[in-house]
């Protein structure tokens, strides 16, 4: 795959990725090269790859528990799934992407980087995808759609007590208020906004967290990973 030069990893990257820092750096070069070449990333994003994209996704790993199965819906160039897999090698990430060229990029990328992820081509709402993936502990997404649509796609992939993590922007609180009722109707409740990685990225990653089914209270108390 084509590589391109990127700014050196910031100091925070070593703290977030640890021994996987070199793989994270390789992923950044792939995004800047093949990712831009194939239209998965805008060329203007290369200079801010680390803070805006890679680290912003990776810090969400603090909301994961060891051994969890994590589905990334609408994975695109692998964000947030690949940074999460690098930062949290103790979880298993499934990258779900409907477009052929993007799913091929994902397969080539994880093979070159050398990480244990699965790639499933299809839409999260497709029955074939649901049958292949089964139920997961966490469904994560980034800049894919509005919360009501994300809930409709995420909920069938979540086990009872599982969590939906939607990486959002500064209007996340307003969006939660707008869609809370629709999310509850689909079985996702106790919706809240978390800020992650404030010690590593500025601004912190903003994540909408929702819980699936009746086991949500006990899950919410143990869901955050302690560093």
UniProtKB/Swiss-Prot annotation:
Entry keywords, A to Z: Cytoplasm, Methyltransferase, rRNA processing, S-adenosyl-L-methionine, Transferase
Naturally occurring in which organism (per UniProt): Mycolicibacterium vanbaalenii (strain DSM 7251 / JCM 13017 / BCRC 16820 / KCTC 9966 / NRRL B-24157 / PYR-1) (Mycobacterium vanbaalenii)
Main location: cytoplasm
Record flagged with keyword rRNA processing: yes
GO cellular component, one term: cytosol
SUPFAM superfamilies in UniProt: S-adenosyl-L-methionine-dependent methyltransferases
HAMAP family, per database record: 16SrRNA_methyltr_G
Gene Ontology MF annotations: rRNA (guanine-N7-)-methyltransferase activity
Protein's name in the database: Ribosomal RNA small subunit methyltransferase G
Compartments it resides in: Cytoplasm
Source taxonomy: Bacteria, Bacillati, Actinomycetota, Actinomycetes, Mycobacteriales
Keyword presence, Chaperone: no
